[in-house]
Amino acid sequence: MKHPLEFIPLNLRKPLFYVFFAMTIAIFGIFNILDQPLRTDSAPNGIVSFELARKVESAQSIADSWDANARLFAAFGLGFDYLFMPTYALALSFGLLIAVGNKKNRYAVFATWMGWGVFAAAIFDALENYMLWCVLTDDIISPYPEIAAICATIKFILLILGLVTALSGRFFSN
């Protein structure tokens, strides 16, 4: 199996990685600002608490803890996240591709799979956001919070695995 970005010429991989990495950091910083009004007693981790609510009652409690301004921040953040998804997926996938280098071992195979996995994470993120949008717009019924939590969990697992795999690349030789 080929890495999803293997078609990119070698001389462009690192520059593109740095561009998407910088964009990821910048957008992450914006999300940090957007998340401040979402941190309440019911949602100590802001939007992440909402993503992982899992139950209608928990999602309702979180949504009820947000005033109109916070709900606007949440709605904007859910929409803005659609810009973040391809950005973080490309940054991490390029990072994995660079970490693989010329390796032809089990690490390279797993890192190649994870190159696809981070794009799958972005798809789960998109589905999660749609479910959260349904909840945020007063449609707090099952199965929206449950599906959002499952998608968020899969997304976080794939992203953490991808990040650990990319960072551990230097410890694996051919």
Q: What positions do the PLM features span?
A:
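Interfacial loop at the N-terminal end of multi-pass membrane proteins
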Residues: 2-76
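Juxtamembrane loop-transmembrane helix junctions in multi-pass integral membrane proteins
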Residues: 4-12, 65-68, 72-75, 102-112, ...
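Lipid-exposed faces of alpha-helical membrane segments in multi-pass integral membrane proteins
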Residues: 19-26, 83-90, 113, 117-127, ...
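Multi-pass alpha-helical transmembrane bundle typical of ion/small-solute transporters
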Residues: 27-28, 32, 63-66, 76, ...
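Short hydrophobic alpha-helical membrane-anchoring segments
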Residues: 32-36, 93-101, 126-129, 165-172
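Hydrophobic alpha-helical transmembrane segments
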Residues: 76-99
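Hydrophobic alpha-helical transmembrane segments of integral membrane proteins
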Residues: 97-137
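Alpha-helical transmembrane segments of multi-pass integral membrane proteins
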Residues: 121-170
